[in-house]
Amino acid sequence: MTEEEPKVLTTREIKKLARPEFEKNPEKFYPTKVFQKWGFTRARCPKCDHYFWRHSEKVEVCGDSSCVGLYTFIGKGCGIGRKGQKLSYEGAWKTFKKSFENAKIPHTTIKRYPVVARWRPDVEYVAAGIYNFQPYCVTGEMDPPANPLIDAQFCLRFNDLDNIGITGRHYSGFNMLGVQVFNKPQKYIYFKEECVDFNLRWLTEELEIGLDEITLIEDVWAGGGNLGPSIEYFVGGLELGNMVFMQYKTHHNGTREPLQVQVIDVGIGLERIPWVVNGSLTSYFDVFPLAIEKLIKMTKAEINYGILKKFAPYSCLLDVDEAEGKVSEIWDSIAKKCNLTKEELLEGISVAKDIFLVCDHTRALLVAIEDGSLPSNVGGASNLRNILRRTFAVCAKRGWMEKMGMDGLMELFQCHKTELAPIMGEFKEYKSFRSIIEIEYKRWLNTDIDSKKKLDKLLKKKKGKLAPEDWILCITSFGLDPEQIASLTGLKIPDNLYYMIADHYERSVPPPPENLYQLAHLKPTIELWNTLENKFQFEGFKIVQVLENKKENDKLNIIILDKSIFYPTSGGQMNDTGKVSFACNKGEKPMEFDVIDVQKNAKSILLFLDHEIPTKDPKSLIGTQVSGSVNEKRRKQLKMHHTATHIISASAKKILGPHVWQHGAKKTEKRARIDITHYSTLSFEEERAIENEANRVIQLGLKVNKYDLEKQEAEKKYGFILYQGGIVPENTLRIVEIEGTDIEACCGTHVDNTADISLIRIINSRRISDGVLRIYFVAYARALDFTNQESDIVHDLSTQWSCPPKDITQTGKRFFETFKQNKKKINDMSVSIIKLSINSILKQEDKNFICRSNLEYRHFVSNVPQFAQQLKELEKSIIFYSQEYIYGLITNPNLDLNKLKAIIIGDPKVKKRQKNSSKKIQFVMKNKVMVKPKGKKKKVAIQITQISSFGDQKIHSIQKFLLENGFIEFN
């Protein structure tokens, strides 16, 4: 890391910085009064040294599993479970919902957000319920959908993959029961004391868990740029929930500042509630009853319940994150407690572990893909590919894929849908889902040969050993999954590998870009490009600020007006351009400037002018009246391209499937592009189908409605498809609706009717990264230009080939076939010429020959080495040359090869000037050639000097040198 680069702290490091201060001041940071009200007292855990609150002095440790040493509820249950009442996964959610909806301060239940966090520029997936409301609800810029609210939010976390199937409590995808409260200065709801009270009432009244069984640990929470004290509550050695009180905004270096909005964020693992109540061996039995039953039935797998029963209470100790490199010793210790050897224990639970792992990973994948993410090698989506390939590897190892096949795997996904529906709602029909899984399976079976070569090269470099960072490199860059690496290298997968990968991604997130202009004190610029979309001239607007351009040596060429009809670069749409006029000094006539760029900073619109403002006093310009105009032709074309982007997006989703989401877009005057999520490249037929569908929408002449809607109402009515183009951080959204086709929250400029666009043409498409395609297209006037260019090509070919347009394809095929036939004849003749020439040379008495040729270089490389043995035995040398190349085999020991090389390469100074030239000299000299003898499979090495050179050759100097050294010109 260079000195200029800021150090980016992880959430763990930020928490560590804050903990000492929080511990010293419990009354300041923690709700001590409500603890005392419920009869809890503060104590310090002798095992971990953390402070906690207990209801009975008989409780000596904090309640964390690592301190208790086992899950004490297994086989016993607690609360209503201990009284014989079984609690289901769905039932646990209902108890929570009932308790908080009927609390003293009633909570509103909201629907879950998609697990793909398209409203967040800094994360890819929702890892906690609060992610749905960061940063804008937390900062107060936007109102939450309800306040206070509760939800069951599906989350993805990939830092615990090492623990899944073992500890009983870890998942890659899970439902987090959430309580979120947003206390603004002008509207207080409730904070720490009430939060603890409501949670304890749910535990004791609905679940009937005794207070003596509950412990509350003081902790620190950090995430999503926020920080605050938190209270974790435990029952029977299991953490059930965490009450976070957000009080601070954190910076990447660990410093913090108070938040204006005080936020409560409660996160409870829904999967843990039925487990602790029922006292099951593992939570997976309570969460995946249908999936486990189906998988066992299809694969005939057998769980060793005897060993699992012995192991389950102690499984809490195997959290890799907390084991700190002592995983092997912990396994030894648990095995001893179970009266087993470590090998017997590992083997005894291995089938169960793999069943749980497959059920967990497939459920996480189901929700992620249903919500619009695709497995890939890029960014966070590489985690999806990782867990999918991990699933394939486990199933292959066990022989399960052979038994259940792809049909069986789809049945497993269906079980998850059935189990999740009561909480998350019904899943929509998703025709392309199976195709996505099948393609990933084929890719896994045929692991990229290049990836294996890279691994082999790395392994040789590291002398057969891979450090943790090497494993991460192979997974994140080479596209290999851990099981493949282990299989190919014979190395053991590091115990905490998945945690390290997650940590790697967290550290890879760059800090936000620096804000060059502090403009929060200014009133928001009144934006008129939407309400007056067809207004291109203005006058009477006033300057409110003049700025020096920080990127152009403080050049005074930026103005901010009180109103603006100029559209700033935003949402992928390029800015308007135009002209403005104003008096630069009092008493002077207005001066005209070109507006060359328009940007939005906070709530202000910055106009960048083509030259510096010649004013004596910049402050005197405040209040100066400005007139101007927007480039109408550019605005119109950008408007066409922006609306066409919406149409292409909707058309791609209709043709390819519901997994298609916009991943980015750019609309310029010349052309537009849209990036979409898709698992394979587009065929010509698919491109045409999307283009045809887009033009069908145009021909229908659909109305494009543009209107404002309250954010809560818009999300409730349309869902998160609104945010195809990204989040709009406003309480009121501008909705752009193409009737019956597409609906998005969008602030860009758009046509009033699809018919205004006239025509859309797709130029081409390409894969820009794994799982993401880029489609280039043009609309309106640019589409007509593109069509005319195609027509010109057809006309030119028709004229040159003297055939009607309909016969161009057949004529081209005929020409190409003739060309291939002639090329083959030329190749055959070239080979014959070379062989005849060399055979003739072999019969000559002279030893050294040079031969000027106009044949292609590749013919010499392919054919001359066949004569290497004969040339060596007869001590003959032969060099072929032309203006573009030199190739030869040399046996002459008296020839000064270094001098020949110097002549070919030339003066180093000249060579330096040629560095960027396409004809720069390249010279290669080897002391052997590889030849494949007739009838043999393997090549053999023949010791003979081989020289080759490419580039603009100095043939006269080379020829002169060789002739002076006894070479004879052979014609």
Residue ranges and their predicted role:
Residues 17-31, 37, 41-42, 49, ...:
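A glycine- and charged-residue-rich anion-binding loop/surface
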Residues 56-70:
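Cysteine-rich micro-motifs
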Residues 1-24:
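Intrinsically disordered, low-structural-confidence terminal and linker regions
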